[in-house]
Amino acid sequence: MMRGLLLAGALGLPLAVLAHPTHHAHGLQRRTVDLNSFRLHQAAKYINATESSSDVSSSFSPFTEQSYVETATQLVKNILPDATFRVVKDHYIGSNGVAHVNFRQTAHGLDIDNADFNVNVGKNGKIFSYGHSFYTGKIPDANPLTKRDYTDPVAALRGTNEALQLSITLDQVSTEATEDKESFNFKGVSGTVSDPKAQLVYLVKEDGSLALTWKVETDIDSNWLLTYIDANTGKDVHGVVDYVAEADYQVYAWGINDPTEGPRTVISDPWDSSASAFTWISDGENNYTTTRGNNGIAQSNPTGGSQYLKNYRPDSPDLKFQYPYSLNATPPESYIDASITQLFYTANTYHDLLYTLGFNEEAGNFQYDNNGKGGAGNDYVILNAQDGSGTNNANFATPPDGQPGRMRMYIWTESQPYRDGSFEAGIVIHEYTHGLSNRLTGGPANSRCLNALESGGMGEGWGDFMATAIRLKAGDTHSTDYTMGEWAANKKGGIRAYPFSTSLETNPLTYTSLNELDEVHAIGAVWANVLYELLWNLIDKHGKNDGPKPEFKDGVPTDGKYLAMKLVIDGMALQPCNPNCVQARDAILDADKALTDGANKCEIWKAFAKRGLGEGAEYHASRRVGSDKVPSDAC
C-alpha cells in the first residue's frame, strides 16, 4: 500500500514502486508511524442462516419498519439479556427483501464503540442471520461520568497529534460541546480539512479488557482517522481507523478497462434514469454544464489539497464533453479535460450499476439528494483527477452515510510518457468499491467495519473482483485470466502476485496462503481469486450477460456474472462488522438463500472449497485452517 502501507482505501503498488516512491504529499506516509499496528482486532461472530434458530418466530404482516426492528431488538435481548444497547438509525430493507438492523452496545450511557450487533430479518418476519462483537465481560461498576477523573478532550487531541505525528497546530484550540453525551468539536485548529471531533467512548481492547477512551476524529486529507486514545493517560493509543481506503461524453466506454482494449467513443445521455433520476448533471436543485451532479463532482486537483468546489473542471454549455487525448500526449495536464470527463463517466456508470444491484439510498449510497428515498444525503463522491498528493496509486475515503466520499486518482510515472489512472476503469472501480463495502458492512452509519487485517484485505479483494467482473469480454471462458493495474503501472502481469485465474497452476493461492501474509492487498488478492472462482461457476451455470447492466426475473439477475456481483453485494450487508473470510463465505451463501432459496449452493460451495474455504475451514488470529470439503448436502 502506498504511504508506508497506511491508506486503507489505496489501490496498492507494484513492488518496484514501493521500493522507489517518486512523490508523496504531506501525510502519515512521510512519518515513522505505522497505522497497521493500531488496527482494531477481529472479534465478530456470525450465525448464518443455517445455524440461526429464531427466538422471535412470529411472522408479521404487513412487513413494517416497526415489526422488523422490534424482532431484531428482541433477538439481541434474548441472546445477551444483560447487555445495554441502542438501535443505530440506519436500518433498511434491502432489494432482496431482507431487513438489516444494527445495534451498538453501551455502558453507563456511553457507546462501546467496537461492540456491534447486526441482525438480518427475512421476508417472513423471522430472524434470517445475525452477527455480533458485543462485550461479554464485566462492565465497570463506577460510572466515569460521575467521578469525571478522565482527561479533557483537548488533552486527547494533543495526545493523538503527538502519538501519530499529525502536524496539527493547536495553539488556539478550544472546544464546543455537541448534543451528544461527552461529545465535542474543536475550533481554532489548523492542519486539518475540517474541525476535529472527540467523543468519550469505551473500546474493547485486543486483550479483551474494556478501556475508556476518547474517539478523536481528524481529517488530515491524506488520512481521515478515528483514534481511540486512553481517556485516563491521554497518551496510549488503543486503536486507529482510517476512512481512506486511499450529455455527450467522449470516453472509453463501459467495459473497456484501459486504452489497450479499444478506442474512445462519444456516448449520449449515458445515465440510467432509474438509478439517476436527476441525470448525472443535476442534483435536484441545480442543473450543471460541467462534470458535477447528484452522484459526483469531478475536477482537477494538481496541488493535492482538500478544497474542490473552486477547482477547475471542464464546462460545456451545449453539453458536449468531447476533449482530445492520445497515449503519447504529454504533459498530463494537457489532457486534463479528457481525464476529468473519463473519471466522471466511470464513477457515475458504476453508481448506476450498483444502484440496480441494491446499493441504493437506504443502503447508504453516495448521492447529494436522496429524493425522499431514505438514507442520508449530501454525500456525493468528490472525484479528483490528476491529484497532486501522490503518484502511482489511488485512494478512496469513506466516512459514514451523509458525508461525501473522496476519491483521488493519481498520475503513474512508471512509463514514458506518464499514464493517468483515470483512464484505467479497473482502478476507479476498485476505489469506488471501498465506498460500497464500507457502507454496507456494519450498516451505512458505521465506516470502521473493515479495519481488521483480514476484513481490510477482503475490502481490497472486493475492489479487484468487481473491477475484473465488469471487464469480462464476450469471448471469455472459465480459463480466461485477468490482471490488475497492468496498463497504469506499465507492468506485465499487473500489480498483484498472480493473475486472477481458475487454474491452480496459474494462481496457487488458497485460504491458508493468508498464514504467510500480513498486508491487506496481498490478502485481498487471495479473496478476489476465490470470488473469481465463484464468478465462473455461476457463469457456467447461468450464462453471461455482456450488456452494461443486468436483467432480472423476480428480482434475481438472470445471468451468472451479475448474479455473482449481486450475491457478493448482498453478502456485505449480511456479514458482521470486521468479518473474516469464513464469515464472509457464509454471508454469500446466506445471500443466495435469501435471493434464490439456495439454488446455487452447490456452485458456491465448490468455488470456496477449491480455494481452501470449504466446510471445516477455520479462522484463528494466529493461523487459518483450510478445507477443500464440499458439504454432503450441497450438491
Swiss-Prot record:
RNA-binding recorded as keyword: no
Example GO molecular function: metalloendopeptidase activity
Keywords for this protein: Glycoprotein, Hydrolase, Metal-binding, Metalloprotease, Protease, Secreted, Signal, Virulence, Zinc, Zymogen
Enzyme kind, highest EC tier: hydrolase
Cofactor: Zn(2+)
Stretches with biased composition (Polar residues): 290-309
Signal peptide: 1-19
UniProt-annotated glycosylation sites, renumbered to this chain: 287
Ranges where the record places region Disordered: 290-311
UniProt KW Metal-binding keyword: yes
Chain positions recorded as Zn(2+) binding sites: 430, 434
Record's cofactor remark: Binds 1 zinc ion per subunit.
Cellular component GO terms, alphabetical: extracellular region
Pfam families in alphabetical order: FTP (PF07504), Peptidase_M36 (PF02128)
UniProt main location, coarse: secreted
Propeptide: 20-246
Protein purpose: Secreted metalloproteinase that allows assimilation of proteinaceous substrates.
Protein name as catalogued: Extracellular metalloproteinase mep
Protein's gene: mep
